[in-house]
């Protein structure tokens, strides 16, 4: 609408990917967890971080502070590249309830080999979760240590804006929620 009148859109309102979080939850510590860490390292080229269980769940055999998952945060061009691979696996289709009210979205894939990683019988096959955090220029004001600020209500990202950005950038299809 603004471009029809010859005006440029405000560059501070432009949406971009702040970070991409990749998560593999194995549910147990040991060999399977270290193999899942190798998968994330192959995919991102970064060293992943182990996550601990918050509390004991006896029915699942999980103890508090036991390492049960592995995750990695990717930023910049590498994040866009990995997200592109993940969306290609999902055929650029997301549900409406994949998007949060704060303008972020997430989805999962069932097999990591769909991302182009060669199958290794010693590692096996793992599914993983993608979570994309969107931002605008100026969002870093909440992250700094000294003189932190709040993001104004007009500058925040809504669910509809995130869905529109996904449709425009990736020619994505948004299916109705369950």
From Swiss-Prot:
Which parts of the sequence carry N6-acetyllysine?
Answer: 52, 85
One GO cellular component from the entry? Answer: cytoplasm
Q: Which UniProt keywords apply?
A: Acetylation, Cytoplasm, Isopeptide bond, Nucleus, Phosphoprotein, Ribonucleoprotein, Ribosomal protein, RNA-binding, rRNA-binding, Ubl conjugation
Q: Does the keyword rRNA processing apply?
A: no
User: Localized where?
Assistant: Nucleus, Nucleolus; Cytoplasm
Q: Which GO biological process entries does UniProt record here?
A: negative regulation of proteasomal ubiquitin-dependent protein catabolic process; positive regulation of signal transduction by p53 class mediator; protein localization to nucleus; translation
* Gene Ontology MF annotations: rRNA binding; structural constituent of ribosome
The Phosphothreonine modification is found at: 44, 47
Family, per the entry? Belongs to the universal ribosomal protein uL5 family.
What PANTHER family does this protein map onto? Answer: 60S RIBOSOMAL PROTEIN L11-RELATED
Protein name stated in the entry: Large ribosomal subunit protein uL5
Q: Which organism is it from?
A: Pongo abelii
Q: What is the lineage of its organism?
A: Eukaryota, Metazoa, Chordata, Craniata, Vertebrata
Q: Which gene encodes it?
A: RPL11
């Amino acid at each position: 609408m603004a471009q029809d009148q010859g005006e440029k859109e405000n560059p501070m309102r432009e949406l971009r990917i702040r970070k991409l979080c990749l998560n593999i939850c194995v549910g147990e510590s040991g060999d399977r967890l270290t193999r899942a860490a190798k998968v994330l390292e192959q995919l991102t080229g970064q060293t992943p971080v182990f996550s601990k269980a918050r509390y004991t769940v006896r029915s699942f055999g999980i103890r508090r502070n036991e390492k049960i998952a592995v995750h990695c945060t990717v930023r910049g061009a590498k994040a866009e590249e990995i997200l592109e691979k993940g969306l290609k696996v999902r055929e650029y289709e997301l549900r409406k309830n994949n998007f949060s009210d704060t303008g972020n979205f997430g989805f999962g894939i069932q097999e990591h080999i769909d991302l182009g990683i060669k199958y290794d019988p010693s590692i096996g096959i793992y599914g993983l979760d993608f979570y994309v955090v969107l931002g605008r220029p100026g969002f870093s004001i909440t992250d700094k240590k000294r003189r932190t600020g709040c993001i104004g209500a007009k500058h925040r990202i809504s669910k509809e804006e995130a869905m529109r950005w996904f449709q425009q950038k990736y020619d994505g299809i948004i299916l109705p929620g369950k």
